[in-house]
Amino acid sequence: MAKGQKGQYFTPRHVIDCCVQMIAPGPAETVLDPACGSGGFLIHTLNYVRRNHDLDVQAYCQTQVWGTDFDHRAIRVAKALMLIAGDGHANLFRLNSLLTPTSNLTLFSTNSEDDGAPRFTIEDVARSKLRGFKGFDIVVTNPPFAGEVRESHILRAYDLARNGRRIERDVLFLERCIDLLRPGGRIAIVLPHNKLGSTHWSYVREWLVRHLRVVAVLGLGRNTFLPHTHQKASVLFGIKRERAVRRPDNEEVLFLVSERDGKDSKGQTVSRAGVTLDDPQWIRADHDLADVVTLFRDFMSTSDIAWGA
């Protein structure tokens, strides 16, 4: 399924599964997807934690699993799928994830970005259930790629938007996601490849490394989001710094490239040998992301980076 109006495309499940295995959520960690769509990242998070830990599923989801999205239909689907996955108490909310506590909304303000959505923020809903909330332990997400945000009451809250009257939505999501992390928290975020490679966006990368200890970058195959878009994307993994630095030290970063993305040039799943149509898509797809997970774990096992609960 695709949510193409704002460049929102539901992430292939084998990509989600790879990201969750690399981020390795623990049972005591809070996990947020601020662009949750149908809840894929949250479902795979639940399955990962349940598979690796003795877990009271409902108690875990009451406080640890959080998802927000602007699309009310996506939230309804996410709630249904999370219920099927074994959770009746997931914290799934329809709201504009780009609204911050400093957005200065008035009761009667209207605009294209948040019109019709509740005016509370992610911090509002988190503080209602998490005592002493100071940020999430993990943010894992695939934010909308396309479109620009022009609303001044939103832009003024963002460092990356203070020099212009409009900015691409995914740039704001990047800053917002890091802001929503506690210091030391981990992130896995899917981004258009140009944000990590184009000279035009170098100021975004300069801001990023001051606030985030980048650990790894995974380049996804060009067919990954077909048949919905040819947009090439990467996944950024990192740890929020305790405080922003002016100029980071030389830090080792692992660069990974997926060379088999599990789809053909028309976006159809390429199945690996020994599977049937009864198997889930992320099991059937002929991809190399299991090798990516192994390479990442090998890298982390020899690194002094504090990663995980």
What are these regions (language model features)?
Residues 100, 106-109, 113-309:
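A conserved structural/catalytic subdomain of Rossmann-like adenosyl-cofactor enzymes
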